[in-house]
Amino acid sequence: MAAFNTQKVLSVHHWTDAYFTFTCTRDESLRFENGQFVMVGLMVDGKPLMRAYSVASANWEEHLEFFSIKVQDGPLTSRLQHLKAGDEVLVSKKPTGTLICGDLNPGKHLYLLSTGTGIAPFLSITKDPEVYEQFEKVILVHGVRYKQDLAYYERFTQELPEHEYLGEMVKEKLIYYPVVSREEYPHRGHITDLMMSGKMFEDIGLPPINPQDDRAMLCGSPAMLKDTSGVLNHFGLTVSPKMGQRGDYLIERAFVDQ
């Protein structure tokens, strides 16, 4: 029995020459928790070429959504970026991943800290009503180099606050904090520096991170994970050592930009 199903591409959206999003059909048997990832790929020379992708759609949605970087000579992304509606992709049957809210200790505020395509699992988590029931505030931080790289900006500034079911919770609880490192922007710099200087907390009107109230999830490059973990440790938070064991913050260790 194959470890994956064939799905049909429904839409493709190119944000920039570096980032694109695609949606595809979802097998009825696929069950996942918001924040998890699956293997996605194509048949190449008669063999499946697969890579790990966080599911960017919520587990209650009928389709699947994925957010990808374009790597011109990347074995898979060099091909995936040319997808069109109607094409076929392979999606694994077994989701996995460490960004599961149930592995966090109870707290008041949930920080979702991401760079680049690392925002993908948080696109799913910010559509999860249970997350808003669990926390008083959910702070989504997305760090990119240039303003044009802020994919999904409109989702958080316009679409989600007006969402038929989630809108009221989003307006009350979700704080979107986009960060740009290489050009002028209200929140300019690197996430870690904005946390250490206290500017981020001043901007959003919350006290600096503390282990009593604050929980976090991290997704980004290996360097970002290392640096941001160091900052959270400095604030007194402890990482969940592995799936199924609770901690103050969680790291997705499965990804490097590919």
Cite the ranges covered by each PLM segment.
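Short, Lys/Arg- and Gly-enriched loop/turn segments at beta-strand edges
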Residues: 46-53, 96-104
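Histidine-anchored nucleotide/phosphate-binding helix
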Residues: 121-133
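Reductase modules of NAD(P)H-dependent flavoproteins
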Residues: 2-3, 141, 148-258
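Ferredoxin-reductase
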Residues: 2-87
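Conserved beta-strand elements of the Class I
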Residues: 110-113, 217
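Short, conserved phosphate/pyrophosphate- and ester-handling motifs at nucleotide-, phospho-/glycolipid
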Residues: 35, 118, 221
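Ser/Thr-glycine-rich phosphate-binding loops at phosphate-binding pockets of nucleotides
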Residues: 115-121
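Conserved S-adenosyl-L-methionine
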Residues: 107, 131-138
